[in-house]
């Protein structure tokens, strides 16, 4: 699907962009330190190979995010579930949550959507104020997040809000991912 170019600065990465983004984050020293912490016995080269094998955002989520979240549930909680008996997994939905933990709450929602049989995960709005590192900005866009531009003056903020609103409408009405 061709996404209008005006959304390029805020939209999630598309599959054809992923290889270059993987290379960029894998070259980042701070990201390498995070990988060494999360995967102490796995060489960065092996992680890079596994990452490059992920041809879509969803494959990346299933390969890296889902196992990490499952480990959190298993080791640090009594469980995490979703009653989806009245939800048609073939339809699209808009989920709205509070501002408690933007990254973790939405990550668990993605995990639960996979658990109950949705073919894809959600796109997540995240403020640019939380994306101070380039590798973090890239990682959330791999993970299907779109950026809410916050650090703007009033006229710019109005334009950015309009663009974000148009992107959300586009994502709901036209994207099937």
Residue ranges of each PLM-predicted region?
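Membrane-anchoring hydrophobic helices of lipid-metabolizing enzymes
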Residues: 1-93, 99-110, 114, 121, ...
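Charge-dense, low-complexity intrinsically disordered segments
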Residues: 55, 59, 151, 155-158
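Conserved Motif II region of HX4D acyltransferases
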Residues: 90-97, 165-177
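Short beta-strand->loop
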Residues: 97, 125-128, 150
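Glycine-/small-residue-rich active-site loops that bind phosphorylated ligands and cofactors
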Residues: 100-102, 131-132, 153-156
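Carboxylate/His-rich catalytic cores and anion/metal-binding grooves
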Residues: 110, 119-132
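Eukaryotic endomembrane system proteins
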Residues: 141-147, 173-177
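Acidic/His-rich structured neighborhood in mature extracellular/periplasmic domains
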Residues: 150, 160-161, 165
